[in-house]
Amino acid sequence: MKISKLIITLLSFLLILTGCASGGKDKPQKDNWNDFENQKTIVIGFDNTFVPMGFQDKSGKNIGFDIDLANEVFKKYNIKVQWQAINWDLKETELKNGNIDLIWNGYSKTSEREKTVLFSDEYLINEQVIVTKKSKNIVNKDQLKDKVLGAQTGSSGYDSFNSNPEILKSIVKNNDATQYESFNEALIDLENDRIDALLIDRVYANYYLKQQNKLQDYNIINAGFEGDSFAVGARKADTTLVKKVNEALKELYKEGKFQEVSNKWFGEDVATDYIK
């Protein structure tokens, strides 16, 4: 009898522990908007090294285009954003487990991701562009025939360059691009005329040239590859949250605040037609 009571007591204790362990981590698959409104806070997961979308400055402060934009969105609802740096490879898992409430940091909307994630409207298209000095008089990609092109090793731009050779690879000198470990190195060579043009993400090109106050000295040409559509990712059940994000983005554009944030980071209006 004593043994039976002991077993029952132990089983009850284990059940309590199991409940405590799982209750705080996994958010139920429900529409959580009322909880966000009541708690006045929301957790957004981001990669804190993705310049210029969301990253940390030298003091450790979170800054970037997406940081500013998200803060403005939730300011409209009197909700404070808690920024949570995450392992970007595990972003969907963090969202599903309830460790974060949104993914917002240059997050590309794809058909594969749409199977498990509810996306907001696309607010920015990150294109692959060709950057050239205006003094080179190159205003379209056809003028890159036999010119020296640079690209970052392993970048999405260089991948597109190789997988779509008819667009650019067949035109440039040696039918290949000079490869660099970083965009900064490539941009230095571009500035010093060691290469004629550079294949690069538009968001990074605009940010870098804006920071250097050199936008006016360069031509930025669409490379002709398919761009990445950036959107905000939520759990499938959080339909009200996504609706509120979409509404706020449109309101921010009408008020001119979206353009203000865009010009701060890129020197131009990057909004998609979904937002305008």
Q: How should each PLM-predicted stretch be described?
A:
Residues 17-19:
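C-terminal motif of bacterial Sec signal peptides marking the signal peptidase cleavage site
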Residues 90, 107-115, 160-163, 188-192, ...:
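A ligand-binding cleft/hinge motif common to bilobed small-molecule-binding domains
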Residues 56, 70-79, 157-179, 209-214:
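Ligand-binding cleft/hinge of the Venus flytrap
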Residues 82-93, 176-188, 228:
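Short helix-initiation/N-cap motifs at beta->coil->alpha
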Residues 21, 67-76, 142-148, 153-155, ...:
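Extended ligand-binding regions for polar small-molecule ligands
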Residues 71, 80-143:
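Acidic, polar ligand-binding/catalytic clefts
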